From Swiss-Prot:
Keywords for the protein's UniProt record, in alphabetical order: ATP-binding, Cytoplasm, Ligase, Nucleotide-binding, Purine biosynthesis
Enzyme Commission code(s) on record: 6.3.3.1
Descriptive protein name: Phosphoribosylformylglycinamidine cyclo-ligase
Catalytic activity: 2-formamido-N(1)-(5-O-phospho-beta-D-ribosyl)acetamidine + ATP = 5-amino-1-(5-phospho-beta-D-ribosyl)imidazole + ADP + phosphate + H(+)
Major place of residence: cytoplasm
GO cellular component: cytosol
Family to which the UniProt record says this protein belongs: Belongs to the AIR synthase family.
Pathway(s) per entry: Purine metabolism; IMP biosynthesis via de novo pathway; 5-amino-1-(5-phospho-D-ribosyl)imidazole from N(2)-formyl-N(1)-(5-phospho-D-ribosyl)glycinamide: step 2/2
Compartmental location: Cytoplasm
GO molecular function: ATP binding; phosphoribosylamine-glycine ligase activity; phosphoribosylformylglycinamidine cyclo-ligase activity
GO biological process: 'de novo' IMP biosynthetic process; adenine biosynthetic process
Pfam family, one: AIRS_C
Cross-referenced CDD domains: PurM
Species the sequence originates in: Bacillus cytotoxicus (strain DSM 22905 / CIP 110041 / 391-98 / NVH 391-98)
C-alpha cells in the first residue's frame, strides 16, 4: 500500500516541514554553552565554564492546561508557547536557579506546519525572555488521540544554582516583608472555571469588550504568563531573598505556604495592590466568594518574595527599575497559612 502511514493519518512530510519552519525561531535562543544543533537525538549543554563552586541542577516541568482551548477557539497560537516556558522557568527561579535550557513537547491530531511554527515561535520568545536555550523537543502527530484542530503542549526546563545560594524558605521568620510582583492577568491557571463562568454560563463572546476590560475578552484571556526570571536574578545579585512563591494553581492560599517554614504564616494586606478587571468580572459573573478567588487565581500577583523589612523599599525600587510593578503586600507572622487584612481594591 503506497503512503500507508499517511493514509493512517500521519503525514511525515508535514512533520519535516514543521521542523524546517521552526529552526529560525529556535536559533534565536541559543546560548554559547549549547553544543550541536536542532535535529540530534539529544540536546547538549556545556556546564564546564559556569562560574559556580557547587553547582546544583534544578528541573521543572509543566503544561498550559485548558488555556489551550481558548487558543483553539480564537485560532491564535503564537503566545501559548510563552505560557509553557513561563510555567516552568518561574517555578525554578523561586529556588534561586538560572534557567539554562528548555525542551518542548507538542502532541497533535494533525501536523499543521504553520500552526506548529506559531507555537514554537512563542516558545522561543519565552526562552529569550528567560535567557534560556530551546535545545530540543518532540512533535507527535497522533490521529485518533486528538482531533485535527487539537494539540497539547508541555515543557521541561533545567536550571542551575550554587548550592549555598539555594532558596528554600527555611530561614524565613516573623517580620519579613512580602513583596508582590504584578501578574499580566490570569496567567495559566483556572481556565476550566473561566470557560464555565464566562463562556458557558455567561454566554460571553471572545470578540467583545466587557465591563472595565480594555481589550476584547479573547485577547484578555490569552495574555501570556509573565516571566519573572530576569528581574528576580537581578534582585538576587543585590539583596538576600528569604523565600519566593510562584502564584499558580491554588492561588495565594496554596502557594505562599509552600515557601514558609513550620510555625510561620503570612498576613496579606488587601488593597495594597490593584486587582485587574478580569478577576472582578469572573467573580461578579460567577458569584464566587472572595476567599475562593484567592484559592484559585493569582488575583493580580504572580510572584511573591520575602525580604528583610529594612530592604523592602529598596527591593521595590529595584524591581520597578527592571520594568516590574511591585508592591509591599504583607508580612510573615507567627502561625500558619495565609490570613487577609482589609478590603480588596479593584482597578
Amino acid at each position: 500500500m503506497a503512503n500507508a502511514y499517511k493514509q493512517a493519518g500521519v503525514d511525515i512530510e508535514a512533520g519535516y516541514e514543521a521542523v524546517s519552519r521552526m529552526k529560525k525561531h529556535v536559533q534565536t535562543t541559543m546560548r554559547k554553552e549549547v553544543l550541536g544543533g536542532l535535529g540530534g537525538f539529544g540536546g547538549m549543554f556545556d556546564l564546564s565554564k559556569l562560574p559556580l563552586e557547587e553547582p546544583v541542577l534544578v528541573s521543572g516541568t509543566d503544561g498550559v492546561g485548558t488555556k489551550l482551548m481558548l487558543a483553539f477557539m480564537a485560532d491564535k497560537h503564537d503566545t501559548i508557547g510563552i505560557d509553557a516556558v513561563a510555567m516552568c522557568v518561574n517555578d525554578i527561579v523561586v529556588q534561586g536557579a538560572e534557567p539554562l535550557f528548555f525542551l518542548d513537547y507538542i502532541a497533535c491530531g494533525k501536523a499543521d506546519p504553520s500552526k506548529i511554527e506559531h507555537i514554537v515561535k512563542g516558545i522561543a520568545e519565552g526562552c529569550r525572555q528567560a535567557g534560556c536555550s530551546l535545545i530540543g523537543g518532540e512533535t507527535a502527530e497522533m490521529p485518533g488521540m486528538y482531533s485535527k484542530e487539537e494539540y497539547d503542549l508541555a515543557g521541561f526546563t533545567v536550571g542551575i544554582v550554587d548550592k549555598k545560594k539555594i532558596i528554600t524558605g527555611h530561614s524565613l521568620d516573623e517580620g519579613h516583608v512580602l513583596i508582590g510582583l504584578a501578574s499580566s492577568g490570569i496567567h495559566s491557571n483556572g481556565y476550566s472555571l473561566v470557560r464555565k463562568v464566562l463562556l458557558e454560563d455567561g454566554q460571553m463572546s471572545l470578540d467583545r469588550i466587557y465591563g472595565r476590560l480594555e481589550l476584547p475578552l479573547g485577547e484578555e484571556l490569552l495574555k501570556p504568563t509573565k516571566i519573572y526570571v530576569k528581574p528576580i536574578l537581578e534582585l538576587l545579585k543585590k539583596y538576600e531573598v528569604y523565600g519566593m512563591a510562584h502564584i499558580t494553581g491554588g492561588g495565594f492560599i496554596e502557594n505562599i505556604p509552600r515557601m514558609l517554614p513550620k510555625g510561620i504564616g503570612a498576613e496579606i494586606d488587601l488593597g495594597s495592590w490593584n486587582i485587574q478587571p478580569i478577576f472582578s468580572l469572573i467573580q461578579e459573573v460567577g458569584k464566587i466568594e472572595e476567599k475562593e478567588m484567592f484559592n484559585i487565581f493569582n488575583m493580580g500577583i504572580g510572584m511573591v518574595v520575602a525580604v528583610k523589612e529594612e530592604n523592602a523599599k529598596a527591593v521595590v525600587r529595584l524591581l520597578e527599575e527592571q520594568g516590574e510593578k511591585a508592591y509591599i503586600i504583607g508580612r510573615t507572622v507567627k502561625g500558619s497559612g495565609v490570613a487577609f487584612n482589609g478590603g480588596i481594591d479593584h482597578e
